[in-house]
Amino acid sequence: MEPIDDLTMCLEDPSQLDQLMSELRQRFTIKEGEGQPVDWLLGMRIHQNVEEGYLSMDQELAITKLAKVILDDNEMNSAHYVKHPMLHSSPLPRLAQDSPLRVTNKREFHMLSCCGSLLHIAGSTRPDVAAAVGILCRHAASFGRQHVNAAKRIVQYLYATRNMGLVYKCGDCRPECFSQGRHPKDDGTNRLVTFADSDFAMDETRRSCMGMVISMNGAPISWTSTLGKTVATSTAEAEVNAAVVAAKDSLHLRSMLQELGIDHGPIILHEDNSACIAQGNGGLRLVRNAKHYSTKLRWLQQVIVNGDVIFEYCPTAEQLADTFTKPLDEETFLKFRERMLVDVSHLL
């Protein structure tokens, strides 16, 4: 067997690519056609239009393949009726290993395989299903018929919206290319726009779900929907935990931009919890009611004092990270989805 490695590169000068490919050919066997613009990468379709100044990413093919495996013909035909991936009014129950409601025949439904495919899609081009997929995956080891229906609903939703994807733009891109899929706080430039939120004690374990999303050039570039490792005892603590996660990721991305020669100022962190903002902006001091999470709070205070992060209050109605903390009602979900994704079929 021959080892196969994939390498994706971004270069401004074509002569740099020629030089690099020449050096690689001296050491490795490279197939004909390599070194060309990327059209497909790990199931993602990438379309770049240099003249009009945008790049789109979607996973229509991967979603269609998954739907054909998970859904029957009737479920695929009725997929267009599914407007959002998970019902906010029907939480999924945890099933014990000896529960009679468990699906014991794993061949009846391959939940782990389905969750793996959904995680890849949710983490690559579909941030709108990140919260629903995260909730589903918590039940992958012990699931019942209700969980199977929830998995199929997510796949149906993805299949019905398989043409939606991310669109990134440069400064002079045509307005119609990004009139949707962009939050009002995102001006479409090389500037990181960060949102952080938390749903306090939402799980049966009373742990809080943390959500964050970072946008740049008109679309999300990083997002997270994860259950906290410990139980937060207040809304402020849960929000501080989410803010720390968002700030760490944002500072890492800022350092990458600086290596690319893009000068970036402080990270603007949008938060809708006044207590979290007050604790973070309070300077390097010990908050009496925050002793049990003082380490995370002190780190957050430090990056704010240093000028690396600036808190900005964001009303809950505009808090994009709310999408990543819990299933939302249809109207709110669709509003936030339009601020992240675009129908890319007319761009291809």
What are the language-model segments listed below?
Residues 1-348:
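Long, low-complexity, charge-biased intrinsically disordered regions
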